[in-house]
């Protein structure tokens, strides 16, 4: 394959891209428009062309690309992408590594991107968007925290103001919205919470489905050492940043990068190209999005590309992205390697500066590279032509060595008025000094203090579950139960253990955790009651990568609510913080319930079940806690998010509707059980009616169920239609509106129905017991054709 590439732009980023792409055996020629003094090398693979990168140049660029049989276009800067360069080339059949105009709005409009993050529950600073100056000022006056003022549109990286007081914030709003310091970019502003912490730059390739992130980098925006002085386009960077631990990067990928790519696709603006996300790592260790960029960062690109492994072909990776097959190519970085970039600027930058000074470059250390930015070639001499002129990047086995090498490279560059910072990567060494005294348990990712806070928050709630036989005091090593005090004569103990499953993913996505606590109890106690047992005690296990005290407290509060509904005591549990096993705030939960049943009351009594016995059904509250892998797949297929309005209940979000907790059937069934009015009960969980009813049937008998005897809840109608799920399949996965069934003698149906209706149950007579030889399956469903 002989690939010709058109690379649009003229900065250090574009030189680094051209340098790396030229190493690919796939690449025959790289045309850089307009390029700089470093990309002007017609004797090699790289050649400048005298066409600009602004919107008025798009037609010329397309014409040139067609004339040269270009097979891939790579826009470097954000402006052409925001202005729709991808559309111009797509119309003539030339693929572009970069997002469409609609997708590029993620960088082109900060208000759009903030609203997107809010919609898709992507962690970011609290914010409000404004087009009205007076309303913006009123908000600044009333808000109770320090703020950042951002011009919504593109402002060449300068449209962010960080005031230190309310007065300064009001002045900043005026500067942006009324004085038009950033032109039309300031017609709309984002006023957001000021976040403190360390920043990370995460560059990630995406084909619209898969996302592959590069090692985390940190850049240096301020002109002066110690991050003092005016903002710049970036005075240096280093990679990988030590604070970007594997656990943190996994959390960023799962809570930010993948949800961003998935959300854009579902919103009809799939993202193809390089997603560059600015992350703030707050003091509590949580990553939050500062901003999205839809292209390679500068100077991060100059720092990261030299770290790609020798078997990683950048051209092949980019082609894989545009061909939607990123998961099929190799993308690796060199092991045990560090890179540092030192940017050299013209004297006076970022304010007024001189151009036209001659540049010379002497001998460089091994694995040290020079990338041109604001340079031009004039009569064979490279001269200064911009504010950030040139950069030295070095790769070495240690960060310390990479810093030393990069500065040696910078020393080899000479031009009049040259300036560079002397402290690139200082944050990495500062962080190392902080931990030199030894590693604490908290630094390993486990907070004893947070665990203690959780216990204090849930103590009273747990205490409210006390019942005869126990005291429900937490904080010890377990719990005791006095069967005699609970009134049992000759009991058998019955145990059940279960979890909530992938329903937890929905709870985590919309930050609502109380109802899944009820689910956990329900899944266990319903399995006890079908054995005739009264639930007595409950214990929960909650495991997470990083303990969010409020989320865990809400979850345990839900567990306590479920215990109260079931009449059992929450006597203990375990909260495990396990970074590396779980990532970020993701969690899993399991519960165990112990109950008791008198020896002569154990269910099912299969010897009593006979032909003609009635099967009664009690309604479910919805999907309950099984089948959510199918449910989530249907939601994805439908292109919905959990914050969208629920299709079958517009008063709720989709996530809220799906989190309706599993019904607990204990208190309404115990009187029926104690009166020996039922011979068997079945909890309809995973496997649906088809798989669960056979558990209670004796040999030679089957169940015949008429699904027209109860109304199919709207949630199941919608899921079936939206996923086009075969009825045979959905009936083996979801409960379809019946959460519990009872086998009852025909002569007892009226009495059982009356008992259950007294406590508010709606009872449906849904089928009967039939001999095996009358049907083909152990559970036969009829009239399913009318479901949806």
Swiss-Prot record:
InterPro entries: ATP-grasp, ATP_grasp_subdomain_1, PreATP-grasp_dom_sf, PRibGlycinamid_synth_ATP-grasp, PRibGlycinamide_synth, PRibGlycinamide_synth_C-dom, PRibGlycinamide_synth_C_sf, PRibGlycinamide_synth_CS. Keywords: ATP-binding, Cytoplasm, Ligase, Magnesium, Manganese, Metal-binding, Multifunctional enzyme, Nucleotide-binding, Purine biosynthesis. Residues 114-323 form the ATP-grasp domain. It is an enzyme of class 6 (ligase). GO terms for biological process: 'de novo' IMP biosynthetic process; adenine biosynthetic process; purine nucleotide biosynthetic process. In the N-terminal section; belongs to the GARS family. In the C-terminal section; belongs to the AIR synthase family. This is Bifunctional purine biosynthetic protein ADE1. It comes from Yarrowia lipolytica (strain CLIB 122 / E 150) (Yeast).
């Amino acid at each position: 394959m002989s690939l010709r590439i058109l690379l649009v732009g003229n900065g250090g980023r574009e030189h680094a891209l051209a340098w790396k792409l030229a190493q690919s055996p796939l690449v025959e020629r790289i045309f850089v428009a307009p390029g700089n003094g470093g990309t002007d090398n017609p004797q090699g693979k790289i050649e400048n062309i005298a066409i600009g990168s602004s919107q008025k140049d798009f037609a010329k660029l397309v014409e040139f690309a067609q004339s040269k049989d270009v097979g891939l276009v790579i826009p470097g800067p954000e402006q052409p992408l925001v202005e729709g360069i991808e559309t111009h080339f797509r119309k003539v059949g030339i693929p572009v590594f970069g997002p469409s105009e609609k997708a590029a709005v993620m960088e082109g409009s900060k208000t759009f991107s903030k609203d997107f993050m809010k919609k898709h529950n992507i962690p970011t600073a609290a914010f409000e968007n404004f087009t009205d100056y007076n309303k913006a000022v009123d908000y600044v006056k009333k808000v109770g925290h320090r703020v950042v003022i951002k011009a919504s549109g593109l402002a060449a990286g300068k449209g962010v103001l960080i005031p230190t007081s309310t007065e300064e914030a009001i002045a900043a709003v005026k500067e942006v919205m009324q004085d038009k310091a950033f032109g039309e970019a300031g017609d709309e502003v984002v006023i957001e919470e000021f976040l403190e912490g360390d920043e990370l730059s995460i560059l990630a390739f995406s084909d619209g489905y898969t996302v592959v992130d590069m090692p985390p980098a940190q850049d240096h925006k301020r002109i002066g050492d110690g991050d003092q002085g005016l903002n710049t386009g970036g005075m240096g960077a280093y990679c990988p940043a030590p604070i970007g631990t594997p656990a943190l990067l996994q959390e960023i990928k799962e809570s930010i990068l993948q949800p961003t790519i998935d959300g854009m696709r579902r919103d009809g603006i799939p993202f193809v190209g390089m997603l560059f996300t600015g992350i703030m790592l707050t003091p509590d260790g949580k990553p939050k999005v500062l901003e999205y960029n839809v292209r390679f960062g500068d100077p991060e690109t100059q720092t990261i590309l030299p770290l790609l492994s020798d078997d990683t072909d950048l051209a092949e990776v980019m082609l894989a992205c545009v061909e939607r097959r990123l998961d099929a190519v190799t993308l690796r970085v060199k092991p045990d390697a560090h890179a540092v970039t030192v940017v050299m600027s013209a004297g006076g930058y970022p304010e007024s500066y001189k151009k036209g000074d001659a540049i010379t470059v002497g001998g460089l250390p091994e694995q040290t590279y020079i990338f041109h930015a604001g340079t031009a070639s004039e009569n064979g001499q490279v001269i200064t032509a911009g504010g950030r002129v040139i950069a030295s990047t070095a790769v070495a086995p240690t960060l310390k060595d990479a810093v030393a090498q990069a500065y040696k490279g910078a020393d080899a560059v000479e031009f009049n008025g040259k300036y560079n910072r002397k402290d690139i990567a200082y944050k990495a060494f500062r962080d190392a000094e902080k931990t030199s005294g030894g590693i604490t348990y908290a630094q390993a990712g486990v907070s004893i203090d947070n665990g203690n806070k959780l216990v204090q928050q849930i103590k009273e709630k747990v205490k409210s579950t006390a019942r005869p036989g126990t005291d429900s005091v937490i904080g010890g090593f377990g719990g005791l139960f006095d069967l005699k005090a609970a009134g049992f004569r000759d009991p058998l103990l019955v145990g059940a253990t279960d979890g909530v499953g992938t329903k937890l993913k929905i709870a985590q996505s919309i930050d609502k955790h109380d109802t899944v606590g009820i689910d956990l109890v329900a899944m266990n106690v319903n399995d006890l009651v079908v054995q005739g047992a009264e639930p007595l005690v409950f214990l929960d296990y909650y495991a997470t990568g990083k303990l969010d005290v409020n989320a865990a407290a809400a979850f345990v509060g839900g567990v306590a609510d479920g215990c109260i509904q079931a009449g059992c005591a929450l006597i203990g549990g375990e909260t495990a913080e396990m970074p590396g096993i779980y990532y970020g705030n993701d969690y899993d939960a399991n519960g165990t319930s112990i109950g008791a049943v008198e020896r002569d009351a154990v269910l099912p009594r299969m010897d009593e079940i006979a032909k003609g016995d009635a099967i009664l059904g009690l309604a479910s509250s919805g999907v309950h806690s099984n089948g959510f892998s199918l449910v989530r797949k249907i939601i994805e297929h439908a292109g919905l998010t959990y914050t969208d309005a629920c299709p079958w209940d517009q008063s709720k979000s989709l996530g809220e509707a799906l989190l309706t907790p599993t019904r607990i059937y204990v208190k309404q069934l115990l009187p029926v059980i104690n009166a020996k009015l039922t011979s068997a009960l079945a909890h309809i969980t995973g496997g649906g009616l088809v798989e669960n009813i056979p558990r209670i049937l004796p040999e030679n008998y089957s169940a015949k169920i008429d699904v027209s005897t109860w109304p199919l809840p709207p949630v199941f109608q919608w899921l079936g239609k939206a996923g086009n799920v075969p009825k045979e399949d959905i009936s083996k996965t979801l409960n379809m509106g019946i959460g519990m069934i009872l086998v009852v003698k025909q002569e007892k149906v009226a009495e059982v129905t009356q008992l259950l209706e007294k406590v508010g149950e709606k009872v449906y007579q849904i089928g009967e017991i039939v001999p095996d030889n009358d049907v083909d399956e152990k559970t036969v469903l009829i009239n399913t054709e009318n479901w949806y």
